[in-house]
Amino acid sequence: MDDYAVLSDTELAAVLRQYNIPHGPILGSTRKLYEKKIFEYETQRRRLSPPSSSSSSFSYRFSDLDSASVDSDMYDLPKKEDALLYQSKDYNDDYYEESYLTTRTYGEPESVGMSKSFRRPGTSLVDADDTFHHQVRDDIFSSSEEEGKDRERPIYGRDSAYQSIAEYRPISNVSRSSLGLSYYPRSSTSSVSSSSSSPSSWLTRRAIRPEKQAPTAALGQDRQVPLWGQLLLFLAFATFLLFVYYSIQAQEGNPFWMDP
């Protein structure tokens, strides 16, 4: 700590910049704090540095700090040389190099598998792309074959249209138990001449028509008079009947009633 008291404010600021220690203006109240930070930094570096290079690499000449032109040469910290020294001598101390991107420990060999792990997804993406193209081709071929089959099919009448719609519609429990079928029969060439009296067309029409009549029933329910309106109409009608009854009774009970 006494070595730093000899330094001027400019020299102390140069040391702080060289050590990458954030600082402000050096005043009488802040000088002791900056000297303490420099002392702690150098103590940590001596503890983490190898014993052989502690006297050579980290020796600083504080007596030759008169000229400001040689500040960078006097306080040069060989960070790259320290890294090479740690890698050559295989030191496993917890010495970290902090940067804005990564934090890496010196002395640990760089993993070669990282490049492989980044290359593998590329091959997997290529394989996935190939399989996707094959699936698209298969879908195109299958769709073209289905279109060809649809063109070969004959044009059905109205009854067959009901059957084609109903082949995806399950029969109700009553009709399934009576007919012993799980689904409606599929349309085929034998059903071209089917008439309206066939059971399949009758069942399909019966299954489709209630769905069409459901909106009309809902509209009819919406148009009905609400309950409170019905009660008001009933009370008005009862009042009218009572008025008629009392008027008749008054005419019959009056003996002096004379017809005009």
Swiss-Prot record:
Pfam families: LEM. Residues 169-188 are annotated as: Interaction with CTNNB1. PROSITE patterns: LEM. It is found in: Nucleus inner membrane; Nucleus outer membrane. Interacts with lamins A and C, BANF1, GMCL, BCLAF1 and YTHDC1/YT521. Interacts with TMEM43; the interaction retains emerin in the inner nuclear membrane. Interacts with ACTB, SPTAN1, F-actin, CTNNB1 and beta-tubulin. Interacts with SUN1 and SUN2. Interacts with TMEM201. Interacts with NEMP1. This is Emerin. It comes from Rattus norvegicus. The modification Phosphoserine is found at residues 8, 29, 49, 54, 69, 72, 88, 99, 142-144, 172, 175, 177. Stabilizes and promotes the formation of a nuclear actin cortical network. Stimulates actin polymerization in vitro by binding and stabilizing the pointed end of growing filaments. Inhibits beta-catenin activity by preventing its accumulation in the nucleus. Acts by influencing the nuclear accumulation of beta-catenin through a CRM1-dependent export pathway. Links centrosomes to the nuclear envelope via a microtubule association. Required for proper localization of non-farnesylated prelamin-A/C. Together with NEMP1, contributes to nuclear envelope stiffness in germ cells. The gene is Emd. Residues 1-45 form the LEM domain. Residues 46-224 are annotated as: Interaction with F-actin. Keywords: Acetylation, Actin-binding, Membrane, Microtubule, Nucleus, Phosphoprotein, Transmembrane, Transmembrane helix. One of its GO terms (cellular component) is TMEM240-body. GO terms for biological process: amyloid fibril formation; cellular response to growth factor stimulus; negative regulation of canonical Wnt signaling pathway; negative regulation of fibroblast proliferation; nuclear membrane organization; nuclear membrane reassembly; positive regulation of protein export from nucleus; regulation of canonical Wnt signaling pathway. Residues 184-206 are annotated as: Disordered. The modification Phosphotyrosine is found at residue 162. Residues 187-201 have a biased composition (Low complexity). One of its GO terms (molecular function) is actin binding. The chain crosses the membrane at residues 225-245. The modification N-acetylmethionine is found at residue 1. InterPro entries: Emerin, LEM/LEM-like_dom_sf, LEM_dom, LEM_emerin. It comes from the Eukaryota. It is a single-pass membrane protein.
